[in-house]
Amino acid sequence: MMVDFSPSRRRMGTQELSLKPQVETPGIKLLAVMFCRYHLIRQLKQVQAASRTRYAHSVPQSRPTLKERLAALHEKQQLSLLPPDAVKRVSENNPAVLIDCDARTLLQLFLAALQTDPQKTTLSELLSQEEGFSVFIHRLLPTYTPSSDLKHLVSKDGTTALLQKLYGFYREQFADAPIGRPSPGRLHDANSFARWFMAESKLRLARTVFAELVGNPTELAKLPRDTETIITLLQLHLGAKHIFWRDPGNSVGRGGQLFTPAHMAVVTAYNSLGEETLLRLLRLLQSDPQWKSVCSPDLDRNIILALAFHNRLDLVHAQAARYYAPAAPGHGLPSTPLLPDGALVGAVVTAFAFKHQLAQGLAIAYQFLDRFTHLPNEHELWKIIFTWLARRHPTGSQGAALYDEAWSKMRTRYAEHGQPTPYDYSIARASYRIVRRDSSLRRVRALLNDYMSPLYQQPAVAPRDRLLLLKCQAHIVGRLVRARRNSAAADFVDQWALDSEARSHLLEHIAARASSRTDADDDDAGDGLYLTGAPLW
């Protein structure tokens, strides 16, 4: 049988496909081959047509995007003609305006707006004064101290790039260091830049800023006698920034074992100028009359942390005792008329707790509380104490005694001042970790009744507070059900459920616990975490 398909031709692009007469070929096999080739060519042509269609539609769609970019650039240029309040308002309402600007566009935009300031008539007059850049920084970023305030201006991971633009522009304007000691405005700018870079864990950049704007950190006598500058020196070169410390044992797990992460912040190396340099600085501050004027509680707090970094806990104790006891004969540190605050006392707790001597640190902190009836920022002290109790909590009766003493002293201090104990999430979270680890139903009930009850008076509860509250309640419910006190668990839910949704979750938890009848230790799933679907920490 002979079949002639010669008139049939198909094209795929530039390649011609034809089926020539086949002689003595079975008809079914030939028809199958023809069918497959026909559909293959048809599909290829459909793909080509779709590609041409997409290309045709892509050209006109790019034009509005180009127009939008031109309009955005025009908007950036027009901002320079607005008064400072308008520039601030536009930048807050439309942060994207500042994201893609280069250094010159971003910075000149605000400098042009500063010309409308009645106190600075011209830009040249503004830049001729060293404090001009401080004014510029205040206008650019009104709340500039923590670098997290920069994150709404830039895209993700772009904060450091913006800081480098700011610093590069600053060096262009004030390239030459002034003769003699830096002015207060220049020191203010140097400390701001150095702390910005430290907040981004860029220690090398921060140290470069300090060396270029302040001076050689090893030449202590030539450094300016300025409190904030000495604090920056302690944090950059003498170990006072404790978030950069390498922690040999960060947290206590079940059974008392320690979890040991590598360190608490991602930095290459947090090296120091050495203990001798720190002690020379300490002698200057304690004995030189010209240096005594820079002393402050914040400076002493950083000195305490720097001493702890160099394992000089004896000097930490002596430095702290200057506030509440006569001078120690061994070290000869004079007493001080300064009033400590909660952050300073918290630094003492951090210094000892980091070296796994939490009990000694708490004992010193309680001496401060006995000596001073009122401490400024005392709430910060309690946050630090309970955070370290959760991280360094000893097992057994010793850990329970430390927690009970701290809990009692905190409530007593606020009661003596006629104030209710204020709720704080970090304290509640740390306390729950402690009492849950101790499997103490009494302490969990006290945490819920005495500390977390103000949440019921709030019109809206934050999600993290609600989750922590649900965890505490689920822990109590689980303990009651394991003791086969299902009715008591149901009564507890009726009394303490925050809302109808929480009540239904807890009732489901009762049913699940009652059906399992497990006597195993509580875990995250057993405490009701599976009901919320979100981790607590």
UniProtKB/Swiss-Prot annotation:
Protein name: ATPase expression protein 2, mitochondrial
GO cellular component annotations of the record: mitochondrion
Subcellular location: Mitochondrion
Keywords, ordered alphabetically: Mitochondrion, RNA-binding, Transit peptide, Translation regulation
Family: Belongs to the AEP2 family.
Molecular function (Gene Ontology), one example: RNA binding
Organism: Eremothecium gossypii (strain ATCC 10895 / CBS 109.51 / FGSC 9923 / NRRL Y-1056) (Yeast)
Alphabetical GO biological process terms: regulation of translation
Gene name, Swiss-Prot/TrEMBL: AEP2
Function: Required for translation of the mitochondrial OLI1 transcript coding for the mitochondrial ATP synthase subunit 9.
Subunit structure: Binds to the 5'UTR of the OLI1 mRNA.
Domain of life: Eukaryota
